[in-house]
Every structure is written in C-alpha cells, then in structure tokens.
Amino acid sequence: MARRTKVRIVCAIGFLCAVSLSAQEVVRDTITGKVHQIEKVTVTARRLPNKVTSSVPIQTLSQQDISQLGIQNMADAVRRFAGANVKDYGGIGGLKTVSVRNMGAAHTAVSYDGVVVSNCQAGQIDIGRFSLDNVSVLSLNIGQPEDLLQSARMYASAGVLSIETEKPHFENERNSAFRVQMRGGSFGYVSPSIRWWQKAGSRTSFSLNGNYMRADGNYPFTLVNGKYVTEEKRNNSAIYTYQIEPTLFHTFKDSSNLELKAYYFYSKRGLPGSVTLYNPISDETLWDENVFIQTRYKKDFSQKWSLQAQAKYNHGWNKYEDKGNEYADGLYRAVHRQDEYYLSATALYRPWNV
C-alpha cells in the first residue's frame, strides 16, 4: 500500500509539473494593446437604397434576385414591383413602358446609371431595349427619390425607375474577366451576349457589354371566317437588334468617382398590323437608332458637402416605311431625328448627420 501511495504521489507531482510547464509556454497576446492597420479594402458593389429609413415607398431587385427568379427581360423584372403598370405593345421587341399612380409613362422617369433617359419625340421610354445582363440593382421609387443628390428631372417625376449597371470587380488578383451567354427560344429567338471587364490601373477599369437579338415571330393561329376555319401564320414580325455599351470607371486620389459611358442601340422590326380577311400582306417596317454619351462625377468634400455633376449627349433617329397602292409612289417614308445636350450639377449640404 505504501509503495502504491508513493507511485500515485509521484504521478500527481509529474502531472502538475507538466501543467505548469505547458502554461509557461503560452505566448502573450499581441493583438491587444496597440493599433493595427489593415490593407486597403475596395468595395465594388452598388449601394442598395435603405428601405427602412426611406420616406417614400421604394422597391429593389438585385442581380442575385433577378437570377434566382429566372427573369429574362427588363419588362418582366419591373412587373415584380407593386404599383408599377407595364404596358406591352407587341411581344418580342415591341414597345414596353412603365408608369406609376396611373399617371402615364410620360410622368415616370427612367434613370440609367444616375442620368435620366429622354425621348422628346415619343415622350415615353421603351424599357424593353435595356438588357438585364449587366444590371446590378433595379429600383422603383414612387414619389421623390430618397437620395437628395439628384437632378431636377427626377424630382419633377411622379416616380423613378433606376437602373444601375454592374461595376467591374476582379477575383484572385486578375486583371480581366470575360463572359459569353446565349439565349434561345421559340419562333427563331436567338440572343447572344458578351461582357468584357479590363483593369487599366489601380484606379481605372473598363467594361464592354454587347448583345444581339433576332426573332421571326411568325407564330401560327387559327382564323375563323364563318364556316371556314384556316390555319394562318403571323407575317412581317421579324426583329433584329444590336446593342453595345462601353463604360470607363475611374477613382481619383481624393476618392471622387468618374463614370464615362457610351451607348449604341439599333433595331429593325416588322409591324404585322391587324388580321384582315383575304389580305395577309403587311409591309410596314420601323427602324430605330439611339446613341448617347453620358458622364457622371461625384465628390464628397466633407461629411457635410457633396457634389454631383452630369453631362449627356443624346441622338435619336427612326424611320417608318410602308408600301402600298394607296400611296402616290407606292411608298410612304417618314424620318424623325432628335439631338439633345444635357448638363446638370447638384450640391448637397447636410447640417448634421443622423
């Protein structure tokens, strides 16, 4: 018994020594007791509007929401917003407008990267021509926008549909990124698109987005004429559209931002018209072309003072053509052209921060 007791005492002493030795090997914490500086962190995502503190109703759809819901075009995305009235004037490639409060599309502004899109001839904006491939945030304000740093055009509208495109961001220290997509559907619908991001320096990046869409639209339908029932096809429904959009992003040393964007859109579409008995001929054609160059500059002088300046040149052109014996030369043609120069500057002063 005495020998066993001695063995136990020796083991206990050895265990305590091991514990004390291991405690002495613990290195002191070097995190606390001094200030540490981390490397610069760059945030590339668009800032979402604050729905909680907003004084007006605001609804948003992020790029992730659009992908999860399987939305394929701008009109379907805007239909997700409560209170938005989207009118479709012709299916694939047709005019699509948005309005709020039943005041008409002329009273709803469409903002593309912070600059209002305009069409002086029609008075309403076709949202169907904008692609969802490079959209980062889509938001709808019913009333005045929450962001006070806006132009007078946006304040004069009953509602604002804001489209913010995606800003280039690079993973794994890459200097470029490239993506190709292809969509397809019924009646000859094909729509390929490309996206190219390129880093031009530590403060400068470049993006190029382009897409092409074509469709026949000659879907079949049943025509009932008394006791005669025939199977017909919709004629003169083909559409071809091209869109290209280069954008330059630059951040200055004082953290001010500059965005320079160019946009080109061209479309040629047939106008099928109404179904007329014994007359399937339809020769109406519409061409549309839109080019604009816009720039936006934002700078925060302090926590109280901010400045935003915008400049834009917009060129619109469309041509309508119809063939028929009712015209003097068998052809009717109408061409419309519009050019617009736009400049806006807004200063914001915050007496206090809440």
Task: Walk through the language-model features, giving the residues of each.
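Extracytoplasmic beta-strand/coil segments of soluble accessory domains associated
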Residues: 75, 79-116
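Transmembrane beta-barrel architecture of outer-membrane proteins
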Residues: 95, 125, 158, 175, ...
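A beta-strand signature from Gram-negative outer-membrane beta-barrel systems
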Residues: 132-179
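Residues on the lipid-exposed face of transmembrane beta-strands in outer-membrane beta-barrel proteins
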Residues: 192-198, 246-250, 293-299, 343-349
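Flexible loop and strand-edge segments within Gram-negative outer membrane beta-barrel domains
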Residues: 217-221, 231-243, 249-251, 255-307, ...
